[in-house]
């Protein structure tokens, strides 16, 4: 076959996603909320095999309203290489290269990795060939009003070190030095190498694109830290020997469980 879902599977997907969206966001039926805040898998009968799970097929990025999120870093300009939105210092330790991507859709220029990057969202890129850590200082921020730590991450196409996918640790540290760690792959299926044929130029157009999907980690995963007085967050790339990722929208969010 052509690799596409059958008409019957496509219909089942549409029925679930369209109906549950309206029943939750318009009808207020709370039992559908967990699907739309990324906290549970879709029903197995929505999966192509009819049983599931199939979390790697349906990737949800939750971006709460402004009143329900605290932006740590939106990576909107080169200042994000040194300072986050809270005014805290940003540090890149051990990376072979890093920088900011300022693209504007087509022709996909403006990023030193994953060329072309068809995206209008500014983002950071980080490449490593030994253990490396991104650290963002939180200046004692109080996170008790939030439930989820989120960051949007794309596994960069064009880097053969990424072909088996990527993984990284997320570390929260409080002002007393207590640290707690969560493994990204325990909370997302999105860290895979972009599928498809490579895009070369306007006449040789493949479908391969780097897409930034949310990694949403409940704060309950970080046991033993004082959420009233957080010092820093770290993204530790020590699960694979090498790779490249693109990152944006590091935020704390309130979601409706």
Residue ranges and their predicted role:
Residues 126-224, 237-257:
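Extracellular ligand-binding interfaces
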Residues 227-236:
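Short, surface-exposed ligand- or partner-binding patches at beta-edge/loop junctions that are enriched
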Residues 4-5, 200, 233:
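A near-ubiquitous, low-amplitude feature marking generic local secondary-structure context
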Residues 28-32, 223-228:
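Substrate-binding/catalytic groove segments of enzymes
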Residues 1-137, 144-150, 245, 253-257:
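Alpha/beta-hydrolase-fold serine-hydrolase catalytic core, especially in secreted/extracellular enzymes
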């Amino acid at each position: 076959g052509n690799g596409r879902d059958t008409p019957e599977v496509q219909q089942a997907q549409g029925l679930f996603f369209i109906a549950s969206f309206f029943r939750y966001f318009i009808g207020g039926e709370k039992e559908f909320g967990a699907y739309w805040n990324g906290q549970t898998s879709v029903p197995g009968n929505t999966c192509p095999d009819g049983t599931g799970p199939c979390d790697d097929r349906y990737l949800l990025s939750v971006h709460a309203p402004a009143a329900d999120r605290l932006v740590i870093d939106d990576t909107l300009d080169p200042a994000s290489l040194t300072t986050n939105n809270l005014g805290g210092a940003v540090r890149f330790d051990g990376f072979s290269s890093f920088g900011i991507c300022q693209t504007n859709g087509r022709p996909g220029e403006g990023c030193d990795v994953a060329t072309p990057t068809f995206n209008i969202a500014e983002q950071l890129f980080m490449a490593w060939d030994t253990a490396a850590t991104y650290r963002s200082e939180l200046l004692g921020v109080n996170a008790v009003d939030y439930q989820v730590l989120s960051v949007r991450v794309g596994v960069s196409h064009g880097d053969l070190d990424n072909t088996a996918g990527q993984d990284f640790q997320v570390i929260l540290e409080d002002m007393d030095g207590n640290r707690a760690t969560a493994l990204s792959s325990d909370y997302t299926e999105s860290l895979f190498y972009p599928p498809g044929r490579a895009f070369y130029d306007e006449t040789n157009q493949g479908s391969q694109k780097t897409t930034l999907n949310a990694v949403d980690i409940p704060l309950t995963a970080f046991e033993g830290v004082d959420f009233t007085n957080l010092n820093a967050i770290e993204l530790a790339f020590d699960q694979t020997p090498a790779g490249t990722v693109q990152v944006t929208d590091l935020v704390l969010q309130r979601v409706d469980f």
